[in-house]
Amino acid sequence: MTLLGTALRPAATRVMLLGSGELGKEVAIECQRLGVEVIAVDRYADAPAMHVAHRSHVINMLDGDALRRVVELEKPHYIVPEIEAIATDMLIQLEEERLNVVPCARATKLTMNREGIRRLAAEELQLPTSTYRFADSESLFREAVADIGYPCIVKPVMSSSGKGQTFIRSAEQLAQAWKYAQQGGRAGAGRVIVEGVVKFDFEITLLTVSAVDGVHFCAPVGHRQEDGDYRESWQPQQMSPLALERAQEIARKVVLALGGYGLFGVELFVCSDEVIFSEVSPRPHDTGMVTLISQDLSEFALHVRAFLGLPVGGIRQYGPAASAVILPQLTSQNVTFDNVQNAVGADLQIRLFGKPEIDGSRRLGVALATAESVVDAIERAKHAAGQVKVQG
């Protein structure tokens, strides 16, 4: 039996978000729908989820002592990481002290860096992956590239949104690629992964829910990447029944091995009927924002339902849908959005995240569309995103 208290009352059920960006904001909103008290934590003030939380705190989440202090102050029933850059050893300590880390502290630690999850997938679970080597010095990096061959990709073991990644075609790129990887790591300079290039027809995110009533799958989400970050996503991605079956089997193995209840974003390469594991996030995925319009339960609603111990039951997908990011480039601490009236309409929505500032290129919103076909939905979403004029 799941007992939920009322926010701001003595018996409140309290959820603490570690990371308060646009994904955390939607998780906070879903918690609010169930009367759950929300505490938003991030490294900067006025982060998106803080706008819809009951309280907020600004800390360095890589500082284990600071993390413990805010947890002891707020006494959350659930600690919900939204990002990778967290003091995961402290999360493990807190979990050992009977706090509930979502989906579990082990999953958060393993997926915080690419080495942990790659070794789990390839070596423990024996799943198909790209060829790979790890290196923690420039000389070992050069040896790894020679071993893997060209072309290959280098990534910091700890980074997100494409930071620090380089597609390497020749030896002339090696010095700069190493330097860029050292600059792009979330927790500073360090270890990298060198991966062989996988031949694939398309990439998918298989949003997979581990809940009290078993493992559930959303329809596969296709997406287009540029500079290591997603630009458009769509659902459903068409694929053969055999490929879908293989994708679901890989995702099931990964989420059950990681453990805990919640939604996982399992990233996979698909080539005809073959499926290759890429990465997994133990939390809602940015490409999954399409589910805000494509499903009866968004990825955020599914995540909250699962970690609260509620059954999922089933997931209804409404048909062809797409998302397209609103990604301006400017410098401002007073952003405004013009021409919004031309970005909304029948089966057409936008979300503006409320980020407090921009300095360069930053994702500030997303357009969402449905249509008779995925191709039409993508075009509608892209057109709507382009209508929003970001000023500062």
From Swiss-Prot:
Reactions mediated catalytically: N(1)-(5-phospho-beta-D-ribosyl)glycinamide + formate + ATP = N(2)-formyl-N(1)-(5-phospho-beta-D-ribosyl)glycinamide + ADP + phosphate + H(+)
Molecular function via GO: ATP binding; magnesium ion binding; phosphoribosylglycinamide formyltransferase 2 activity; phosphoribosylglycinamide formyltransferase activity
Protein name: Formate-dependent phosphoribosylglycinamide formyltransferase
Residue positions binding Mg(2+): E267, E279
EC number, as in UniProt: 6.3.1.21
Pfam families listed in its UniProt record: ATP-grasp (PF02222), PurT_C (PF21244), RS_preATP-grasp-like (PF22660)
Main function: Involved in the de novo purine biosynthesis. Catalyzes the transfer of formate to 5-phospho-ribosyl-glycinamide (GAR), producing 5-phospho-ribosyl-N-formylglycinamide (FGAR). Formate is provided by PurU via hydrolysis of 10-formyl-tetrahydrofolate.
Annotated pathway: Purine metabolism; IMP biosynthesis via de novo pathway; N(2)-formyl-N(1)-(5-phospho-D-ribosyl)glycinamide from N(1)-(5-phospho-D-ribosyl)glycinamide (formate route): step 1/1
Quaternary structure and partners: Homodimer.
Family the entry assigns: Belongs to the PurK/PurT family.
Residue stretches making up the ATP-grasp domain: 119-308
Gene Ontology cellular component annotations, sorted alphabetically: cytosol
GO terms (BP aspect): 'de novo' IMP biosynthetic process
Swiss-Prot/TrEMBL keywords: ATP-binding, Ligase, Magnesium, Metal-binding, Nucleotide-binding, Purine biosynthesis
Residues the record lists as binding N(1)-(5-phospho-beta-D-ribosyl)glycinamide: E22, L23, E82, D286, K355, R362, R363
Residue positions binding ATP: R114, K155, S160, S161, G162, K163, G164, Q165, E195, G196, V197, V198, E203
